[in-house]
Amino acid sequence: MTVSNNKELLLEVNHLGVSFKIKNDKSLFFAKPQTLKAVKDVSFKLYAGETLGVVGESGCGKSTLARAIIGLVEASEGEILWLGKHLRKQSAKQWKETRKDIQMIFQDPLASLNPRMNIGEIIAEPLKIYQPHLSAAEVKEKVQAMMLKVGLLPNLINRYPHEFSGGQCQRIGIARALIIEPKMIICDEPVSALDVSIQAQVVNLLKSLQKEMGLSLIFIAHDLAVVKHISDRVLVMYLGNAMELGSDVEVYNDTKHPYTKALMSAVPIPDPKLERNKSIELLEGDLPSPINPPSGCVFRTRCLKADENCAKQKPPFTSQNNSHFVACLKVL
């Protein structure tokens, strides 16, 4: 996959696949376990200081993709290269060093925090792992400085997670991820569990911290309006497959794939006149089973443009300009 960019290439994902074995019903004692392919043949690149938005319906493989990149689930095929090094070939000791540069912010802010630890201990935990030489006073100083940076008062350092709102808990999670100054943050739907008014605050905080610290972000969400606000490039996924990938301008203003068009039509427009006159593309049917996906194009069972060729051939993920990639026979 070719994308012209003068910035440093941090992450390269090539033909990544993640599969899980699914146990059959207990009555079928001799039946072989089925295979669920959560991520199939996904490729993209991430450059220094860039934000890649990953969007799609629930169950499309967004979070599994993120967890495979950081090593929380094992990839079954493909390559994950971090600064040119193959992550899948790394030992546990090498992974520990890599995770200094790659941190993650989780979807449920309260569930991701240890209820038995105060927030000072939570934020300081990465420092104790990666910088054990620091004194208690130095750790406290760094923690309080990071709390200020994410919008938390330092005098709250001894309080516990249950004493904070959802938005504040997410700020604690952000502080914990940033305390060791990583190069990349994977944000797994960081605002989906928050009120709309708080979502904008957290997204703007991430943008501000990205600019200040030179971070690269993988921002996973199902809200295309939020993704547009923060992303430089956008990857659209469906049933574990990459459907479309391009810059935010290309994906939002020159949408190619029928699935992306359907997602875009569901995004509300603040202008009442435009909202009243816009066309809505409704998807037919339900999301197919990932254990038994459709042949050919996985989206064909819900696509209004699908024909018999779509059932016979899986569309290649290709581009005409080396930046805007689409997996659709009707676009090629």
Curated annotation (Swiss-Prot):
It is a peripheral membrane protein. Disulfide bonds: none annotated. Its EC number is 7.4.2.6. InterPro entries: AAA+_ATPase, ABC_transp_ATP-bind, ABC_transporter-like_ATP-bd, ABC_transporter-like_CS, Oligopep_ABC_C, P-loop_NTPase. One of its GO terms (molecular function) is ATP hydrolysis activity. Keywords: ATP-binding, Cell inner membrane, Cell membrane, Membrane, Nucleotide-binding, Peptide transport, Protein transport, Translocase, Transport. SMART domains: AAA. GO terms for cellular component: plasma membrane. ATP binds at residues 56-63. It catalyses: a [peptide](out) + ATP + H2O = a [peptide](in) + ADP + phosphate + H(+). Residues 23-264 form the ABC transporter domain. It is an enzyme of class 7 (translocase). GO terms for biological process: peptide transport; protein transport; transmembrane transport. The complex is composed of two ATP-binding proteins (OppD and OppF), two transmembrane proteins (OppB and OppC) and a solute-binding protein (OppA). Part of the ABC transporter complex OppABCDF involved in the uptake of oligopeptides. Probably responsible for energy coupling to the transport system. This is Oligopeptide transport ATP-binding protein OppF. The lineage of its organism: Bacteria, Pseudomonadati, Pseudomonadota, Gammaproteobacteria, Pasteurellales. The gene is oppF.
